[in-house]
Amino acid sequence: KAYGTTHDLTYVAGTQYVHSFGKLLFMPSDLTLGAEYNFDGLKDVILGYDRHFKQDVRIGSFFFQNEWKNKQWSFLLGGRLDKHNLMDHVIFSPRANLRFNPTENVNLRLTYAGGFRAPQAFDEDLHVGVVGGERLVTVLADNLKEERSNSFSLSADLYHKFGSVQTNLLIEGFYTDLNNVFALRQLDQPDAQGNTVQERYNAYGAKVLGLNIEAKAMFTRWFTLQAGITLQQSHYDEAIAWNDEVPEQKYKKMMRTPNTYGYFTATFTPVKRFTASLTGNYTGSMLIGHSAGSGVEEPVAVNTPKFMEVNMKLAYDFPVCKYLTLQVNGGIQNITNAYQNDFDKGWNRDSSYIYGPSLPRSYFVGVKVSY
């Protein structure tokens, strides 16, 4: 009954022109002009739930930019004009970029970019969930406006060699200001088919800011290590209610946005055809909504635990012939078995109450043919 059919037709056509100036005003530059047309026709039908959805999206765009650059400096100015058929006005998204290389091993960059998300249905809106035994569908609020963003970033990309060890360090600070930000809330009234309704609407503004650090080191030809961590804060300008059944539960913090997350990758190649890799992903605690059902008697927002997922993979390449290689691999996914342990169960579960790594500890083997 819950199954349906989705037809999605997408096509893109565009053109681009690039002209290089030996000198334009004060420095050599590259001028880029372009135009693009996007069409996406989406039709989703679930007969068992009497759900019929059709959406045609047409976007005509024109973009331009000029980048002045030499070995030490680059300065970019540009913008993009978009006309979306679900909006009655043209959107202008500016961008600017400043790069400075005081030495060959230091790259400093300051960036600004504007952007938007149109008031349209997205892939995740087509999903029909289950909350407390009732179907949950996502709808767009009346008079939904586009979400606008202004993003700034400042980064330093550093390279250095310590003896025989080659290293790279990237430090980036970022800040994004969002207006008419999209948010979701569960309404207390069902739709005409009796479905529980989750509405996408314009909340107040929001801000996302943080720091990203990534490092890479090549100790030898057979051992490399890469790691990164992101520290961020994601907050609405004013607290909003996530569920109309509990209007007193208001939060400024954005749901499903951890303040800390990171990764590491270690690769060993002791012999030519053998590779061993150890990878890990860290996800900090985040706030998520838990609707009433088999797990809780009334809706409540909870802070999830932290997760550290570690994976291992071993691979060996067998040359079959001059142009063909057979790889045999195997390993363990999620060695630490970092996995959610409080899933809802039964007919009245909250099907969206899922977080953390997608799989518990798992073992795998594989074969790969390359030529």
Please identify what each model-predicted range represents.
Residues 13-19, 62-68, 96-100, 154-158, ...:
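Residues on the lipid-exposed face of transmembrane beta-strands in outer-membrane beta-barrel proteins
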Residues 33-39, 77-81, 96, 110-114, ...:
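Transmembrane beta-barrel strands of outer-membrane/channel proteins
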Residues 69-74, 174-177, 195, 199-292:
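Gram-negative outer-membrane beta-barrel transporters
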Residues 179, 282-291, 316-371:
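C-terminal beta-signal and adjacent terminal beta-strands/loops
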Residues 1, 109, 143-201, 207, ...:
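Membrane-embedded beta-barrel scaffold of Gram-negative outer-membrane proteins
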Residues 7-11, 54-60, 90-92, 148-152, ...:
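Residues that define the transmembrane beta-barrel architecture of outer-membrane proteins
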Residues 20-28, 70-73, 101-105, 149, ...:
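Outer-membrane beta-barrel channels and translocator barrels
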Residues 1-88, 167-175, 210-212, 218, ...:
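Face-selective signature of the C-terminal outer-membrane beta-barrel domain
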